[in-house]
Amino acid sequence: IETFLANDSIPGTELVTRACERLTYEGHKAYCGINGDFFNVTDHKEFPLGAPRGGSIRDGEIQREPRDAWWGFATIDADNIPVFDHMEFEGTVNAGDAGVYKFQHVNIPRADCDACDLTFFNRYAGERTRQDENFSEMYGVERTEVYLKLAAGEKWKVNSPVQCIVGRRLENKGGNPIAADVCSREQVKSPGPFCVI
């Protein structure tokens, strides 16, 4: 059993038959797909289209953060035991002397709450970072993006720290490219100590 996103991207839709063709290769056969979550459709008027409304994790890499909601989650833990429960997510960046910063959003920024000024983007976000597509008041707001790469020997995992190397830093309105092996932290509002790691 594996998790997958349409076109391996938060924004996007894909027929299950096409996904099975794409995910089948020598030694690995994808033969069916189950809609494991609700997702954004045109009638919801929530964006990006195709984005799961709950959480999604693949091989220790968060595609969409689990959010406290009225529905529970189905998952398989590291010991291959099924878990059905409500789950929440909170990430932490420990920047040493520059401080510790918490974030709750992965790949889909939100601007409608006090804790929404920090978003983590990875390869599942699509080709570029983005602004909150559901809160037009945030369009055009300057932001700071800091690009991170896993340190040598590290791999993504949940419920455990990972060490990253800080790369470039950009200050603009977002929409910057995301490379497959690079992640971006985006901070809206005034740049704080996190942005000068």
Go through each PLM region and give its residues.
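Gly/Ser/Thr/Pro-rich low-complexity, intrinsically disordered segments
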Residues: 1-197
